[in-house]
Amino acid sequence: MLHSKSACFCHILFILLFMKLLSPVISSIARLRKWRIDNWINHPVAAQREVLQHLVTSAQYTEFGRKYSFHKLFNVKEFKAVVPIHEYEDLKPYIERMMQGEENILWNEPVYWFAKSSGTSCDKSKFIPVSDESLQYNHYKANKDVLSNYYKYFPSSDLLTGKGLVVGGSHQISKVNDQVQYGDLSAVLIQNSPFWGQWLRTPELSIALLDEWETKIEKLALATADEVVTSIAGVPTW
């Protein structure tokens, strides 16, 4: 028992020292994004136009893009005049086809993951397409930008000297077919997170994605009791 506690203490000490050494490096890299974030803040309209143009250009050869002649849309005014506001029920037929494996419907990349909402309207769950590009350049890049902005104001922070306690929803991943899956958004994000995200978080996936809340809390507490936790994060859709 004594040997086990000693080994655990040494393990924690090693991680703490390692992260202490690595923290300045990571924080310096994170601050490199500062100029980009500042540019968005100083030129918000131009930034939004850039995003819109990227989306329209990328989706111009999809079924949805061809329907509304995306290849002819070059500014916000034209887009608003041609593309009507769509509610979920309007997009549902497209999404259902995507979930069956059809490609080039709403987006120009294959979509293998769908986030299932908790059903805030009409008491029905909605399925939101989550493309790989959305994961990489929306969700995960946003994490980096939040980190970058944090270090802008707290450059000497010890945030990265420990791990982030991840509190997510339940996994409950369901398969539509061999390639397409859907589940809680937090589970989709955790399941597809890059290696650096997995390295900096706790607890392990089997606990973080448990369905039963009381069981999850108990196991989470036991699993992280000896961890160095410096932050709490999650995408709680409940």
Locate predicted features:
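Cysteine-centered motifs
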Residues: C8-C10
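Active-site phosphate/ATP/adenylate-binding loop shared across adenylate-forming ligases
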Residues: F18-A47, L52-W238
